A protein has these predicted regions:
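Exposed, low-structure sequence patches enriched in small/polar residues
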Residues: 1-216
Length: 218
């Protein structure tokens, strides 16, 4: 009998209206998000084994945003009954459209409120992301254990093709000369490491270390 698993997933998303930007600024407008599709495939080796592998691949596409890819794998190692180690890592290369940038006051702007005319600036983006999660559980004895979780994370956002919204609840845009640089990169490291020792029944000692580092490059 074959205990491997294999999967395919197709997703079709119609055009929708998005109001997320109205929470950023009360002058923002509801915009339209384009229709997009995705295809996802994966397989998993026999879960009864000491070593389990689950790679996957995903591709998504929109007419404006273009084609993006994501791929990764999860590996689980159980060499003995008291040791469990897993690593789950993924790489994402995804373009996007209609990414909020800024509101620019402009005497010739498209929109107007009590304070004057303004333009709502958007951009196309390219997001490159690397995310890894490592988990380790060791039971030295029934009274002494060690648990570890570590997650390095990196994301880079590149902004290009700045434009201004032409009409609310639409994808209508006009090229816009924007002098700012919105590109950024984030490097994060998070982790929790816990040592537990029950040196006598009902009496426990915990040693805990938490890691939380974040660097933002702009």
């Amino acid at each position: 009998m074959n205990y491997w698993n294999f999967g395919l997933e197709l997703e079709f998303n119609p055009e929708t209206y998005q109001d997320d930007d109205t929470y950023r600024d009360d002058r923002a407008k509801i915009i339209k998000d384009e229709a997009w599709q995705s295809f996802n495939t994966w397989f998993t080796t026999d879960r009864r084994k000491k070593y389990v592998l689950r790679p996957w691949f995903k591709i998504n596409k929109g007419e404006i945003r273009g084609i993006g890819t994501e791929y990764g794998a999860r590996i689980t190692l159980k060499p003995t009954n008291n040791i469990n180690f897993s690593i789950n890592s993924s790489i994402e290369d995804r373009p996007g459209s209609m990414q909020w940038v800024y509101i620019v006051d402009n005497a010739n702007g498209t929109f107007e409120d009590a304070n004057g005319k303004y333009d709502i600036v958007y951009a196309n983006i390219k997001r490159e992301q690397l995310n890894t999660e490592l988990r380790l559980n060791i039971a030295f004895t029934s009274r002494m254990t060690f648990e570890a979780f570590y997650q390095p994370f990196n994301v880079k956002m590149d902004y290009k093709d700045y434009s201004s919204l032409e009409r609310e609840k639409s994808l209508s845009i006009n090229p816009f000369s924007y002098n700012g640089d919105e590109d950024f990169e984030i490097d994060n490291q998070r982790g929790t490491f816990v040592y537990r020792w029950e040196y006598k029944p009902g009496s426990l000692v915990y040693i805990v270390y938490n890691l939380n580092l974040s660097l933002i490059h702009i």
